[in-house]
Amino acid sequence: MLYQQIQSNKRRTIVLLFVFFILVALVGAAVGYLLLNSLETGVVAAIVIGAIYTIIMVSNSTNVVMAMNHGHEIKNADQAPELWHTVEDMAMVAQVPMPRVFIIDDDSPNAFATGNNPEHSAVAATTGLLKIMNRSELEGVIAHEMSHVRNYDIRISTIALALAAAITLLTNIGGNWWFWGSGDRRRNDDRNGGGGLQILLLVFSILMMVLAPLAAAAIQMAISRNREYLADAGSAELTRNPQGLISALRKLGNAQPMKDVDSSSAALYISNPLKNKERLFDTHPPIEERIDRLEKM
């Protein structure tokens, strides 16, 4: 059953990533039209930028993501014995190599995994998580992260993060340049003889500038929700004790948001680190629903 869930999750994620690439191309077309009056140039530029972002993130994702989230690497068990040994044990059970281990200095309990593949992965936990979780709860959380590593969710998340960052960059460039630089020229061109097609393309381009970041967030949300349910099930399988993760999720659900977190990395965490802050899209399923699914296992 779990194998079937993993395969289904991979198929859905492939579809979502394909939609993501299409969105990058559409944003590129919009930026190209606004800045250069060329849809084709914009599409090519967007694909190149998206590819560069993806290559950079995939090849160096751990260092980039940990720097964005202020993670400090621990090199041996003496620095954080409980966390180190829990990661070591869960990696052994999941039959994946021991990942690099990081600690984030934040009182809010949370954790995430990142990397390119099980051979190049990392797990981070906040100081708040280590303070409030007992042994079985910590095992449940770390097993959840090991499931992300084992299922290659970390690579998918890295690619999605890179594409979302590329879309943000493109829309910022297009919006700022058009509105503050060439906007007057463009509007004058439209008034002085722009036909219906030009007006339609202009409206499309402006709408893309506004809606593309929201669409990117929605796709990230869908990818993240698929990952979280599957990783919860994987945690229960690895620990053979779903109650540990259930208890941990209850504590996570009552926690305050993290003080200093990179918003583009929010989908990586086991629990939404931006909770109680206004967000149009939530990258995580409701805690209550996750607990309900675990209790039925």
UniProtKB/Swiss-Prot annotation:
Pfam families registered for this protein in UniProt: Peptidase_M48 (PF01435)
Compartment(s) of residence: Cell membrane
Principal EC category: hydrolase
Gene Ontology terms describing biological process: proteolysis
InterPro entries referenced in this protein's UniProt entry, alphabetically: HtpX_protease, Pept_M48_protease_HtpX, Peptidase_M48
Principal location: membrane
This protein's name: Protease HtpX homolog
Membrane disposition: Multi-pass membrane protein
Keywords: Cell membrane, Hydrolase, Membrane, Metal-binding, Metalloprotease, Protease, Transmembrane, Transmembrane helix, Zinc
Binding-site residues for Zn(2+), renumbered to this chain: 144, 148, 228
Entry's Gene Ontology cellular component terms: plasma membrane
Chain's gene name: htpX
UniProt entry tagged with the keyword Membrane: yes
